[in-house]
Amino acid sequence: MTSFIAGQLGFTYGLHEASLEFPQSGLITIAGPNGAGKSTLLGILAGLRSPYRGSCTFAGREVAQWPKREFARRVAFLPQSVRMEFPFTVEEVVLMGRTPYASGWFQTAEDRSAAEEAMTTTDTLAFRGRDFRTLSGGEAQRVILASALTQRPEALLLDEPATHLDLRHQLSLYRLLGELAKSLLVVAVTHDLNLALRFSNRVMVLEDGRIAGDGTPEEVLTAALIARVFGVQATLHGGWMSYEG
């Protein structure tokens, strides 16, 4: 079974004739140099970039033709960063993820149950009453992830989710994404090839808007491909890469 299928997919800038097929579960990372088209591809999958050339379907329907509310119940998107200007609590931010289900001003029992479940999954229950603006980078990222999970999506799309995290929180986040990917599709854009190598079920590498490699981490992240696409020499040591300029 598949969720996203794209054929000859292109955009005004950053993407050219990309064809892909994503399953209903698993952790897929999209890597590549700056300007390779990673965020453009993710934006098309998330329904945020249109019009696009070619075809991109989710669950058999063209992404651009999905009703926004219905699509948001099935596909969750996490941008690189989220800023809150007002003093929302963690729990209030998490409940914002239920917006696609909202039928009025008040939260339902199902909304609260979904938020509780998401905060438990992301280990954010302990600070549910705190002002979101006071959180550390790692805490804030887990809260935003919890908000996305309250949508109870079939696909979770993340644009460089580890960018502002230290190494410990990067590893913790990707372990969690790996667990989530056992039951839903997780697609994450990353610049960190070590995270892609260690945690992905599948890696897609983009170069100049085209797919340069697509397969298991071991198949794709070879020294030859890394040298050609990224312009650096890579050596694998015990499941981790080291680089030379």
Regions found by a protein language model. Give the residues of each.
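Conserved ABC ATPase signature
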Residues: D131-L135, E139
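ABC ATPase nucleotide-binding domains
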Residues: A227-G245
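Catalytic Walker B motif of ABC-type/P-loop ATPase nucleotide-binding domains
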Residues: L156-E160
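Helix-to-loop junction immediately C-terminal to a conserved catalytic motif
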Residues: A46
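Conserved ABC transporter NBD signature motif
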Residues: F22, G54-A64, F71, R130
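Conserved ABC ATPase "signature" region
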Residues: L95, A109-F127, I144
